């Protein structure tokens, strides 16, 4: 980088549009969409798609709902030519879909292009030429008048060829390539030359496509350019005003949104922003931005993972894990505060109300995503995320104080491993902490069974204590109090919760007991799970008794160590 970039790079001059209207407008309907994945996207690949992959992507674009699809550059590629012929000859184009083909402004290429789409019921022929000063001066050595003559001649030639094939409904699309770097008056003159030569009118619309061939200014400047053209193009009622934003400055989506506010009727782009250099505008992001504002995009991304898989298989370009809406991590929260907010948001969300879950701009379920990956746990996570995973995946709803206790257990694990742990890992850690007997581990007290007397006030426990099988009896005003009495420990039960986990034949009772033990600071939790609620309650009491006794023993060991020191 140089010390003074202004000596090398000139800022783009703002557009003189003092009465601009677009900033106060909102987008209330979806634009017409044109997918250029099979042309602009394909020509930007390390290895362009073969016929099989092109067909796979074409079918996916149709399934998504695109009504206009640019299928290739048939005059530049035999593969593209053959692909277009296959679509037409095998009648693979749905009745509500129109294909588009592209050609440069040369007679031989135009003729080859028209030949490629011969017999199609509908076809858009996309004719373009560069108009910006640098291209006129450096590349072509042409004056403005010569450029206008080139446009008039080649649009006229295309009209001559297509008029001879009345069985096809022909539409002209004209693009002043490098529009965003061209003087507005020159762009307007170029477009009017094409419009007038073609003869736009009722039943004979012309698509005027205005590209940011290379994005060279902020998105608001592009919007000013579009609004200026929108005001000056005639006959506007017979013109479809289209935009083709690129992403060289990283603002392709913003440029497209501003352009729609400024008067654009149609947007060209690619799935996931594929395309030359930094790519075309990403239609997935643009469409779902509309969706999250309550405007249906008329494209179906209800299985976003399937769309991503097809795109990746056809282009060999992976979707970035942070890609808006589609990436593997975009609905994932590792941060403890984020997880807590999401958990509370899900709990408060009205299924029939407006979506208001913090940190999630869209319901992942609308895109076919599960909630499994929304909360993921690493050393930065907190109790909210851990509680969310246990509740969603296992039906375990922990009291708030228990969330604090168990999150410390998980934190120690993630700090030690320095890795993320998933829902299965958390469940295993939960079982290891609170349900150790079910994992085959040995505790000071192990439960084997119980018998209640007829009144429910007395209990006989079948236990192993320090490995010795024995039977203990106790009395109380219920199974929990009777179990505490039978154990003979100075333990006080502070709270008890029960709920069902699972459903049908898999349903089990989950009991959670909070208790305190004399000589141990604070309280602790125990858990029991069984098809029988009384059994689950007894197991929970024994679980917390074991955990509190471990803490008591650890405290005693620490005291001895201090005395010896």
Regions picked out by a protein language model, each given a short descriptive name:
Residues 1-107, 369, 374-377, 381, ...:
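N-terminal capping/small domains of soluble enzymes
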Residues 40, 44-45, 74-78, 132-134, ...:
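Short, small-residue-enriched loops and turns at beta-alpha junctions
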Residues 4-9, 33, 46-68, 84-90, ...:
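Alpha/beta enzyme core
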Residues 135, 210-212, 240, 268-276, ...:
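Short beta-alpha connecting loops at secondary-structure transitions
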Residues 1-39, 294-473, 505-510:
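A mid-to-C-terminal "edge-of-domain" accessory segment
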Residues 214-350:
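Catalytic alpha/beta core domains of metabolic enzymes, predominantly
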Residues 521-562:
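Mixed-charge, glycine-accented linear interaction segment located at domain edges/termini
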Residues 490-519:
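Generic long, charged, amphipathic alpha-helical segments
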